[in-house]
Amino acid sequence: MATEEKKPETEASKTQSTPSSSNNQSKPAPVKPNYTLKFTLAGHTKAVSSVKFSPNGEWLASSSADKLIKIWGAYDGKFEKTISGHKLGISDVAWSSDSNLLVSASDDKTLKIWDVSSGKCLKTLKGHSNYVFCCNFNPQSNLIVSGSFDESVRIWDVKTGKCLKTLPAHSDPVSAVHFNRDGSLIVSSSYDGLCRIWDTASGQCLKTLIDDDNPPVSFVKFSPNGKYILAATLDNTLKLWDYSKGKCLKTYTCHKNEKYCIFANFSVTGGKWIVSGSEDNLVYIWNLQTKEVVQKLQGHTDVVISTACHPTENIIASAALENDKTIKLWKSDC
């Protein structure tokens, strides 16, 4: 169920987007976004674990400790369907590039590939010996990568559901896995304090990113252009790395993250922002370049575990843990 936030329209907001201003391609980057709450999506009965917008921008998928996946309208928050089949809670969900398939990672030690339109399970991926915590499709969507509490990263064939490679990736649970833009590389992160870059084809480790300190790495992903890596560590820090140089370029702080694996994002539809949830129940938005906190979104009543940025519009989805159980959709003019 989506509840809509109604706000009186001010004169200022009416006059902001004149045709001349929106068509002017050389306008300077916005200083700050103005995200406001539009919808609250209720339906999950336990903590929400992950939210992801479909690549075509139409849908939002959510996963939860309640063992369910739910699909919602990306623009209006309207509940579409529930997809069920896992025996235990789900930690992550991800879309195929054509927005037709989902993959989910569960505590039941399996991943499942789902046909979204029918809600049917097409394949169950078995092989991990402990909770599966994270998953993603490659851009071609013929492969899936997964990370588990069994400390391994696995690469799966989508068509057959067979495991193609098992990478002895880490010495602690794997917190995140992500393909780069052409699918040639995988990045993984772990509680062992390491981020590793893998060659998809050979399964070889090409690089290990190590900082002076090595707090658990709770999340990692490639930037949209594939040149950088955004990594979260459980010392209240997000870092932007140039991975080819193995160099940390930017550090983002002020949020709280010491316990949970909280997703972070690049927001590129308007200004260039970094977006993350936080253990103080807020969504934080930083200016990517200046590293300053430009907005904090208030409304959740528990840890904001997951955020997602819409592929084409200035829309953020956020999701929170057990004391909240809701998903919120926020929109901005820039």
UniProtKB/Swiss-Prot annotation:
UniProt xrefs under SUPFAM superfamilies: WD40 repeat-like (SSF50978)
SMART domains xrefs: WD40
Ranges where the record places region Disordered: 1-32
Keywords tagged on the record: Chromatin regulator, Nucleus, Repeat, Transcription, Transcription regulation, WD repeat
Annotated WD repeat ranges: 43-82, 85-126, 128-168, 169-208, 212-253, 256-296, 299-333
UniProt keyword Transcription present: yes
CC annotations in GO: histone acetyltransferase complex; MLL1 complex
GO biological process: chromatin organization
Basic and acidic residues compositional bias, start-end: 1-12
Residues annotated as transmembrane: none
Subunit record text: Interacts with HCFC1. Probable component of complexes involved in histone modification such as the MLL1/MLL complex and the NSL complex.
Function in brief: Contributes to histone modification. May position the N-terminus of histone H3 for efficient trimethylation at 'Lys-4'. As part of the MLL1/MLL complex it is involved in methylation and dimethylation at 'Lys-4' of histone H3. H3 'Lys-4' methylation represents a specific tag for epigenetic transcriptional activation. As part of the NSL complex it may be involved in acetylation of nucleosomal histone H4 on several lysine residues. May regulate osteoblasts differentiation.
Stated name of the protein: WD repeat-containing protein 5
The organism of origin for this protein: Xenopus tropicalis
